[in-house]
Amino acid sequence: MLRKYQSLIPIYTLLLLVACATAPESDVDTPEYHFKAGMRAIDNADYQQAIKSFQRSVDLDKKFALGYGGLGLAHAYLGQNGQAKDYASKCASRGSKDSEALALSGQIWITMRDSEKKWFKRASSHLKKALKRDEAHEGAMYWYGVAHLYNYQFDEAEDYFRKVVNKRGDYAGKADAKWKLAQKIVRAMPGTPAGKKMALKEKINRADLAVLFAEELKIGVLFDRMPVQNTDFQTPGQATQTANVTVPNDAINHWAETWIKDMIRYGIMDVEPDGNFYPDDTINRALYAMAVQRLLV
């Protein structure tokens, strides 16, 4: 009697799985379409909408690896690393034979690079597996190039971007832009880790600029080497250097306070009329040009 019912267990299991999945409401209510919608939301930085789209994709198909990867990517952008890592693992396990899913898992780890020490190792593991499955996979090559770029391995990054550009596929435009960025950084050759990190930022603020001037251009060393005038007369710049510097209120205990104080002391960057420095304000071209001009005078 028991054997008779044992043969029905797989059927009941299948029926249970089907019952747990959400039924589509239209022929175009598919996991693939919801995934594409989620990725467009990611591009628009609408991460909550992205989560809704990705969640719908896995509700429709519990085995849809890319949906879990999309959820991981959205949570990574939101700084919710625990959830992001869980979904990255689900994506890689459910899509272990799918280069696109493995590449997406790698992308999740790249997105968490500022807060996860082992991001490059984890991303590389997924991307290597993706390329092992398909050595010509465009997305995996592109993201491996991005991983090398953010790991300051510029030659390796350029190699991957070159291959992607030559394929002239969907990633060619993005790869070309990243390739040019890598070339610019190599030509500029930032000499410090801070310089390399700033070179990869799309925007920098006033605090970042203070650090760059101090560490990359060695402003303090340059001013210390300037000949001392044997006269009672001092230029405004020399007077600024010898005077005690009052740290603006909004720079006190700021992570860049030391560098901000130096730039004020040497007259390279100004305190605003209201007494604040505004260290977190984004630098525009005019402010940057003004600071550079003061260095040259």
Where is each model-derived feature located?
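Bacterial N-terminal signal peptides that target proteins for export
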Residues: L2-P10
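C-terminal motif of bacterial Sec signal peptides marking the signal peptidase cleavage site
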Residues: V18-A19
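N-terminal propeptides
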Residues: A23-D27, N81-Q83, S96, E100, ...
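Alpha-helical segment of the N-proximal tetratricopeptide repeat
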Residues: S26-K63, Y77, D114-S115
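Conserved structural position within tetratricopeptide repeats
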Residues: R56-D59, K90-S93, S125-K132, N166
